[in-house]
């Protein structure tokens, strides 16, 4: 619910509004991928705001790697990646691949929404794990307390994670209302998927595509070799 407002959301929104340079970096990086992630959400009939989750997870960096061994712009750990069909081998890491990781993330989020019945709880479970969220729900219910996200006791990171996501979604929807400016992102595909039918030299591929080698690398981050 993007109309929701409380102190926790406002605190995150204020942080973003005071860090314009961070927003500039994120929107510049997201420009390559956002049309694709939004389009995929639309095709699935899930909230398009979910395409903003990589802003929170990785600042939309498909090469991001965390201390917990999470990788890619959706930050899958190895085990969860395998559950959702992301190949991880010497040649390729599907957690970093834009197409594969987006499919897996939306599969995971849809599954979590089916389990918990709200997108706020689904996002919390994406961050903390479904087990942690379910235990917190059970604890509240046993104590006769509400079991919505805002009433749960969860790890501190998760307690700020959902408000941060909602704050970002509100800023993107109405930046002028909160005193921030955002780089425009073209409402058209930045890339298209091409099957090479086998291995191809990257320099040759870049030449055929009419892009720089660096740009081709940014669009194919899943390849280790």
Regions found by a protein language model. Give the residues of each.
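Short, surface-exposed glycine/acidic/tryptophan-bearing loops
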Residues: 7, 63-85
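Extracytoplasmic and endomembrane cell-envelope/extracellular-matrix remodeling and assembly machinery
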Residues: 1-39, 43-44, 83, 88-115, ...
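Alpha-helical scaffolds flanking conserved acidic
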Residues: 47-54, 71, 119-124
């Amino acid at each position: 619910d993007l109309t929701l407002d409380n102190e926790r959301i406002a605190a995150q929104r204020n942080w973003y509004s005071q860090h314009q340079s961070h927003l500039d970096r994120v929107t510049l990086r997201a420009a390559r991928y956002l049309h694709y992630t939004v389009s995929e959400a639309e095709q699935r009939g899930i909230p398009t705001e979910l395409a903003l989750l990589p802003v929170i997870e990785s600042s939309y960096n498909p090469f991001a790697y965390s201390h917990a061994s999470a990788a890619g712009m959706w930050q899958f750990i190895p085990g969860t990646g395998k559950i959702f069909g992301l190949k991880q081998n010497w040649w390729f890491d599907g957690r970093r691949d834009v197409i594969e990781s987006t499919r897996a993330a939306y599969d995971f989020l849809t599954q979590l929404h089916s389990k918990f019945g709200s997108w706020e709880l689904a996002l919390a479970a994406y961050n903390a794990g479904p087990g942690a969220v379910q235990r917190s729900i059970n604890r509240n219910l046993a104590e006769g307390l509400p079991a919505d996200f805002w009433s749960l006791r969860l790890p501190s990171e998760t307690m700020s994670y959902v408000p941060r996501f909602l704050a970002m979604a509100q800023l993107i929807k109405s930046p002028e209302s909160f005193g921030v400016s955002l780089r425009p992102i073209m409402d058209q595909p930045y890339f298209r998927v091409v099957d090479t039918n086998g291995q191809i030299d990257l320099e040759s591929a870049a030449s055929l595509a009419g892009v720089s080698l660096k740009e081709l690398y940014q669009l194919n981050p899943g390849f280790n070799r």
